[in-house]
Amino acid sequence: MSESNSAEGSDRSEEQVSGAKVIAQALKTQDVEYMFGVVGIPVTEIALAAQELGIKYIGMRNEQAACYAASAVGYLTGRPGVCLVVSGPGLIHALGGMANANMNCWPLIVIGGSSERNQEAMGAFQEFPQVEACRLYSKFSARPSSIQHIPFVIEKAVRSSIYGRPGACYIDVPADLVTLQESTTSIKYKECCMPPPLSLAETSAVRAAASVLRSAKQPLLIIGKGAAYSHAEDSIRKLVELCNLPFLPTPMGKGVVPDNHPNCVGAARSRALQFADVIVLFGARLNWILHFGLPPRYQADVKFIQIDICAEELGNNVRPSVTLLGDVNAVSKQLLEQFVKNPWQYPTDSKWWETLREKRKNNEAVSKELASKKSLPMNYYTVFYHVQEQLPRNCFIVSEGANTMDIGRTVLQNYLPRHRLDAGSFGTMGVGLGFAIAAAVVAKERSPGQRVICVEGDSAFGFSGMEVETICRYNLPIIILVVNNNGIYQGFDADTWGKILNFQGTATTIPPMCLLPNSHYEQVMTAFGGKGYFVQTPEELQDSLRQALKDTSKPCLINIMIEPQSTRKAQDFHWLTRSNI
């Protein structure tokens, strides 16, 4: 009896630690650096504990934006960011960010508070089957069974998020576990998980791929964001230059090899895809972005060489001639070695190169002609050509919107890998400001002086516009360009809008695509202490952007009015499903 009392007294005298602090320490041990979230019951203590250990916490205004930001950190750094949310509705708001991370194959950890375990099935505050709900949107979804179990679950979540094809993972933390105290000696932290193992393709398959590429009459390399994530820029650029091959980047593959490289045929995209006879896919999937690899966008007998980290991705939609399973950078080096040992170069004077150069020149001329129009309001091309003239070559470009993103991608150049973030594989609107905040936070430490330019359509800006307050609160010198056409796809000018309002019943007469004309979005920025500009002419755009780039002490929003009916130049093929409107 006395021994028992002595043991109990000893336990009480031992140093205690809360579940919140165990979570924070486990994250720190796994080299997690960034956390984004919206705090409240029961997760506030977790954010405070994380800050005590030096984990950077960025408080956002909406869980979706927080989740988008955390996922972008994962893409930019290769280590998952954490999204911290409250239970029930807070977690549900983050599901969009989890799905987006999974679709883009970006590492992400979502930590969600949940109702107390002893209230399960009783109708507890914000009770929801969170672990089950997150399984559809994640690689791994679990709830620690005890405080002692937390380090194990966190290590597994971090490891799962970065191993194989990266993706989202969810950790559910009941409210009672956050505040529960346990002896520090009972907690065993897991060692930091090792970097993902690098997998190489089979040597015979690499030789076969080199042979197919050597036999090509009209070759093309397609560089995807998987190549950017794996840091394959050096090996792919060497392959491009050694073999004199034309390449085409996907939207977030831009910058792996600079857009101004003479072998870039982005301006001849449709022609390159339609007539290539051998295509090498570097971490690019044959999904909707690449038109599934099917006719009429491609030749029926085109040969694909597919390089991907994920075996399940190989052969989707089209049977490839050669599959190279492995890390994109490692496999690119293997392929490069084949041509270093046995040099081969695609002839510069070939008919294929002549066709691509001519199409590239013609398309660039059409865009420049549209950009040179002096009429007001401005069109998209005029805006983007003036922006491109002033953008620093090392800046991050974040972009979302319909025409704003599609046209901007063709004009705004990327010269560095992992410096473009956009709607991505899921085509998600609302990612812009979250992505921009993530890029600015990462750049502040890893590449000081690099600016973040966030190019938003006016409709897209509306999804996460209140994150401007977050930007100002943390004084992130982000430049937001809102390309304002008064609508979704297209809008109306003030005169036409006034006539519409003369009809009775605005809910039945205002077209669904229309937004309020001449909205002063720049005042959202000035309301929180940043700088704002309302511009209507090329001269005003040039002056405001020049001032914004010069001032690194404050964020800025430039509200750029354009022709409400402005659209893209004529396309050879429709980008997505045709609309009957």
Swiss-Prot record:
<dbReference type="GO" id="GO:0001561">
    <property type="term" value="P:fatty acid alpha-oxidation"/>
</dbReference>
<dbReference type="InterPro" id="IPR029061">
    <property type="entry name" value="THDP-binding"/>
</dbReference>
<dbReference type="InterPro" id="IPR029035">
    <property type="entry name" value="DHS-like_NAD/FAD-binding_dom"/>
</dbReference>
<feature type="modified residue" description="Phosphoserine">
    <location>
        <position position="2"/>
    </location>
</feature>
<protein>
    <recommendedName>
        <fullName>2-hydroxyacyl-CoA lyase 1</fullName>
        <ecNumber>4.1.2.63</ecNumber>
    </recommendedName>
</protein>
<comment type="similarity">
    <text>Belongs to the TPP enzyme family.</text>
</comment>
<keyword id="KW-0443">Lipid metabolism</keyword>
<feature type="modified residue" description="N6-succinyllysine">
    <location>
        <position position="368"/>
    </location>
</feature>
<dbReference type="InterPro" id="IPR011766">
    <property type="entry name" value="TPP_enzyme_TPP-bd"/>
</dbReference>
<feature type="binding site">
    <location>
        <position position="63"/>
    </location>
    <ligand>
        <name>thiamine diphosphate</name>
    </ligand>
</feature>
<keyword id="KW-0479">Metal-binding</keyword>
<keyword id="KW-0576">Peroxisome</keyword>
<dbReference type="Pfam" id="PF02775">
    <property type="entry name" value="TPP_enzyme_C"/>
</dbReference>
<feature type="modified residue" description="Phosphoserine">
    <location>
        <position position="4"/>
    </location>
</feature>
<dbReference type="GO" id="GO:0000287">
    <property type="term" value="F:magnesium ion binding"/>
</dbReference>
<dbReference type="GO" id="GO:0006631">
    <property type="term" value="P:fatty acid metabolic process"/>
</dbReference>
<dbReference type="InterPro" id="IPR012001">
    <property type="entry name" value="Thiamin_PyroP_enz_TPP-bd_dom"/>
</dbReference>
<dbReference type="InterPro" id="IPR045025">
    <property type="entry name" value="HACL1-like"/>
</dbReference>
<dbReference type="GO" id="GO:0097089">
    <property type="term" value="P:methyl-branched fatty acid metabolic process"/>
</dbReference>
<dbReference type="GO" id="GO:0030976">
    <property type="term" value="F:thiamine pyrophosphate binding"/>
</dbReference>
<dbReference type="GO" id="GO:0006625">
    <property type="term" value="P:protein targeting to peroxisome"/>
</dbReference>
<dbReference type="GO" id="GO:1903512">
    <property type="term" value="P:phytanic acid metabolic process"/>
</dbReference>
<keyword id="KW-0460">Magnesium</keyword>
<keyword id="KW-0456">Lyase</keyword>
<dbReference type="GO" id="GO:0005524">
    <property type="term" value="F:ATP binding"/>
</dbReference>
<comment type="function">
    <text>Catalyzes a carbon-carbon cleavage reaction; cleaves a 2-hydroxy-3-methylacyl-CoA into formyl-CoA and a 2-methyl-branched fatty aldehyde.</text>
</comment>
<feature type="binding site">
    <location>
        <position position="485"/>
    </location>
    <ligand>
        <name>Mg(2+)</name>
    </ligand>
</feature>
<dbReference type="GO" id="GO:0005777">
    <property type="term" value="C:peroxisome"/>
</dbReference>
<dbReference type="GO" id="GO:0016829">
    <property type="term" value="F:lyase activity"/>
</dbReference>
<feature type="modified residue" description="Phosphoserine">
    <location>
        <position position="6"/>
    </location>
</feature>
<dbReference type="GO" id="GO:0042802">
    <property type="term" value="F:identical protein binding"/>
</dbReference>
<feature type="short sequence motif" description="Microbody targeting signal">
    <location>
        <begin position="579"/>
        <end position="581"/>
    </location>
</feature>
<feature type="region of interest" description="Thiamine pyrophosphate binding">
    <location>
        <begin position="404"/>
        <end position="489"/>
    </location>
</feature>
<comment type="function">
    <text>Peroxisomal 2-OH acyl-CoA lyase involved in the cleavage (C1 removal) reaction in the fatty acid alpha-oxydation in a thiamine pyrophosphate (TPP)-dependent manner. Involved in the degradation of 3-methyl-branched fatty acids like phytanic acid. Involved also in the shortening of 2-hydroxy long-chain fatty acids. Plays a significant role in the biosynthesis of heptadecanal in the liver.</text>
</comment>
<dbReference type="GO" id="GO:0106359">
    <property type="term" value="F:2-hydroxyacyl-CoA lyase activity"/>
</dbReference>
<feature type="binding site">
    <location>
        <position position="458"/>
    </location>
    <ligand>
        <name>Mg(2+)</name>
    </ligand>
</feature>
<dbReference type="Pfam" id="PF00205">
    <property type="entry name" value="TPP_enzyme_M"/>
</dbReference>
<keyword id="KW-0597">Phosphoprotein</keyword>
<comment type="pathway">
    <text>Lipid metabolism; fatty acid metabolism.</text>
</comment>
<keyword id="KW-0276">Fatty acid metabolism</keyword>
<dbReference type="GO" id="GO:0006629">
    <property type="term" value="P:lipid metabolic process"/>
</dbReference>
<dbReference type="GO" id="GO:0106376">
    <property type="term" value="F:2-hydroxyphytanoyl-CoA lyase activity"/>
</dbReference>
